[in-house]
UniProtKB/Swiss-Prot annotation:
The keyword Metal-binding applies. It is an enzyme of class 5 (isomerase). It comes from Homo sapiens (Human). Pfam families: FAA_hydrolase. Its cofactor is Mg(2+); Mn(2+). InterPro entries: FAH, Fumarylacetoacetase-like_C, Fumarylacetoacetase_C_sf. This is Oxaloacetate tautomerase FAHD2A, mitochondrial. GO terms for biological process: oxaloacetate metabolic process. Requires a divalent metal cation for activity. It catalyses: oxaloacetate = enol-oxaloacetate. Its EC number is 5.3.2.2. GO terms for cellular component: mitochondrion. The lineage of its organism: Eukaryota, Metazoa, Chordata, Craniata, Vertebrata. The keyword Secreted does not apply.
Length: 314
């Protein structure tokens, strides 16, 4: 991102402090880069629009990727808790580049038509079992990275989603045990090429969902103990400042526990795996007439307690 773009983004984030949704100040794990550091590092975001505590400086034995951090479980989380409680130097936000909180996971699991009110806007029945599809991990980008419109599609749409990040390996997980396998939650933008999703490729959704840059995540992995109730969070999307989606995760048909139990019948979950849990109503394709993203648009996806991600469309 150009310096001018980064300054503009910082201004937007500082203005976000006036928005109705305020992220939690509890444990907010991030992956970031800084000019004086070699490669990605792990950190703690200090608050909405705030700076970053360098966890790798606090404890050089910590891994530098979120997946490795999660694989070590309580041992690394306890270090992060100590860092959160200590009075540590904070890197100014203007000096760091936020990466997706998880990069290159083993899998990105997605759920279709998982909001009651989203089903209503399509005039379709509520599913009786989860509708599962996927994105390739190569679609993941950071919370403030650009979304690139592919030349193959003329119908690129927005979708704000609550994303679950897995923290513990498991298969055939019972719903009652599912939250023990969750590390935390983050904001996702499930960018979707509707022509490829709905008409091309035999109407299989994969290609329409998995173009490069079609899965912005962030800004932080908010640990599950920092989120009061993941199934009662305000969720919204803005395009160029206009609210296009506004809902609540209490409208989800299948909750986090149900999704983990269902999907783990088929595949093994690993630390760092991501589950996109579906989108509320208000997507562009079901508007009359339909509305799609164009170059120059700015999309803001926001979830109460988790934060906001901002992506310029290019």
């Amino acid at each position: 991102m150009l310096v001018s773009g980064r300054r503009r983004l910082l201004t937007v984030l500082l203005q976000a402090q006036k928005w109705p949704f305020q992220p939690s100040r509890d444990m907010r794990l991030v992956q970031f880069r800084a000019p004086h550091l070699v490669g990605p590092h792990l950190g703690l975001e200090t608050g909405n629009g705030g700076g970053v505590i360098n966890l790798n400086a606090f404890d050089p034995t910590l891994p530098k990727t979120m997946t490795q951090f999660l694989e070590q479980g309580e041992a690394t989380l306890s270090v992060a808790r100590r860092a959160l409680a200590a009075q540590l130097p904070v890197l100014p936000r203007s000096e760091v580049t936020f990466l997706a909180p998880v990069t290159r996971p083993d899998k990105v699991v997605c759920v279709g038509m998982n909001y009651v009110d989203h089903c209503k806007e399509q005039n379709v029945p509520v599913p009786k079992e989860p509708i599962i599809f996927s994105k390739f991990a190569s679609s993941i980008v950071g919370p403030y990275d650009e979304v690139v419109l592919p030349p193959q599609s003329q119908e690129v749409d927005w979708e704000v989603e609550l994303a679950v990040v897995i923290g513990k390996k498991g298969k055939h997980i019972k719903a009652t045990d599912a939250m023990a396998h969750v590390a935390g939650f983050t904001v996702a933008h499930d960018v979707s090429a509707r022509d490829w999703q709905m008409r091309r490729n035999g109407k299989q959704w994969l290609l329409g969902k998995t173009f490069d840059t079609f899965c912005p995540l962030g800004p932080a992995l908010v640990t599950k103990d920092s989120v009061a109730d993941p199934h009662n969070l305000k969720i919204c999307c803005r395009v160029n400042g206009e609210v296009v989606q506004s809902g609540n995760t209490n409208q989800m048909v299948f909750k986090t526990e149900d999704l983990i139990a269902w999907v783990s019948q088929f595949v093994t979950f690993y630390p760092g795996d991501v589950i996109l849990t579906g989108t509320p109503p208000g997507v562009g394709v079901f508007r009359k007439p339909p509305v799609f993203l164009k170059k120059g648009d700015e999309v803001q996806c926001e979830i109460e307690e988790l934060g906001v991600i901002i992506n310029k469309v290019v």
